[in-house]
Amino acid sequence: MNPKTRSILKHLLLFTLTLLTTTLAGVEWQFSRFLFSSNPVTWEYFLKGFAFSIPLLGFLTVHEFGHYFAAKWHKVKVTLPFYIPLWLGFIGFPTIGTAGAVIRIKDLVESRRKYFDIGIAGPLAGFVVALGVLFYGFTHLPPPEYIFEIHPEYEEYGLDYADYVYEDNPLAFQVGTTLLFEFFKEYVAPQPERVPNPHEIIHFTWIFAC
């Protein structure tokens, strides 16, 4: 096997492993199901995990190829992205399934402008994808009762569950907000009551992935 083919296979293997680990992570965040637990990951739930891994890896891939194609434009030799799988679900500890991805520059970059172009291209490309993913996520929010499918124990409180279930709960945490999130919440979400509680965003993968 020639070195080029071996290198491509290595990148494909890392991507495949990262797709697997991020899909498992999606199941863990959405449904609190872990591979080795009393509430295991079935094939049905594994397929649902792609709702997390596809937007996350889509964002990550476009980000890295933004760097890659900018480098090619400037005739700077770089590698394909190295995806980094990171999954701790086997010990019951949720992660997003990856530590990201990197490309390696194999040439001396001769100017600050080239460095700047290569550096900025990734975030700009990824930001465009993030906008699309968030737009889809906010325009396809399920009814507020969806949370009872994940947390049936909330149902006794009705849609006012947030006033009760997080009190005196040391494990309760919430995802912080951003200006972009607030914009989509205010102007894109079809109905305010469909916007998930900050404690529950982890179950809404198209939003959580970005």
Spans of features found by a protein language model:
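Hydrophobic transmembrane alpha-helices and their immediate loop junctions
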Residues: 1-210
